[in-house]
Amino acid sequence: MPSEVESTGREFLIGLLASMGLIADIEVGVVNENMIEFRVSGRDLGVLIGPGAQTLQAIQELLRTVIHYETNSSSGRILLDVAGYREKRKAALVAFTAKVAAEMVSSGERRAFEPMAAADRKVVHDAVGDIEGVSSTSEGEEPHRYVVLLPE
C-alpha cells in the first residue's frame, strides 16, 4: 500500500491521541497487499479499546474513512490494534470456544454464544474447525448476530 495511506493514518492517530492527552507509539505494517495494520502501544490505552472493544471498532472505522477520503482510495482493508488487544482477544476466544465445545460434546446440546462482532465470530468458527465432533453456524441479524455450536 502506498506510503500516503501510512502517513494519513499515522497523522490521524497522532491527532486523536493528542486530543485525548495520550502518549503512545504507532507502528504500521503491511499484513498483505490488501491490508495495512496500525498498532498503537503505550500505557493507559484502555480508553481506546472501550467496553466490548466498541471504541476500538469505532476508531478503526474513523481511521478507515479518513484514509479513504484523504487518499481518494477505497481499496485495501485497514486494521487497528491497541496494546495487542486483538491477539489477546483471539486467544481468549479460542480458549473459551474449546471449553464450551467440550461442555457441548458432553451434554449433546447445542450452545449459543452471546452476540459478537463479525471478526470475533470468525475466530470462533475457525477454532471450531479444529475441534472434532463440533460444527458452528451464525444466527440472528446484525448487530445481534451470534454463533451456535452444534454436535456433529
Language-model features: locations:
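RNA-contacting regions in translation and RNA-metabolism proteins
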Residues: 1-152
